[in-house]
Amino acid sequence: NANSDVMHGGFQDNGNFITFSPNPTSHWNMPFNGDGCFAGIADNEEDFYLTIQRGVMYKMKLDTNAERLAFNRMDPISADSTNYMFINPMVMDDNADIIYWAEGHKFWRNNDLANIQYNNSHAKSDLGWHLFSDSLPSSSMKISVIETSVNPANVVYLGTQNKYIYRI
């Protein structure tokens, strides 16, 4: 939501922080500690997606003080976490509540975020995750960045540690 006052981000070595205020000097709150990484906010501005080191991802329901009301771990159980980067790439699509996820040279998508129920579990889950069958051409390549296009929609860019960029 371009008109929203909500800001959410991962601060490496310093957790994940959120503010609900447009005031640049307002206090930011930390709902989850760890090496804060990538973050996303659902269109409803009630569901927050955050990652910490080694590919751990959570969906959280927060109050306006960024206190956890409910959570659910959601990184895919079928992914081999030994292929993750320390700060593992994740992005939320700019046009829809869809998350894209990297597993080394493999590429994942979850377009069923609304159906991930809160159960206050720290267990990984495959709910809604789909592995692209035609990920990168070589297993020696690693996806290091993922970005989506606003216009045109439905375009995803992958960058690799080998200095290649792919458009999907």
Where are the language model's segments positioned?
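Beta-propeller blade termini and top-face loops
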Residues: N1-I168
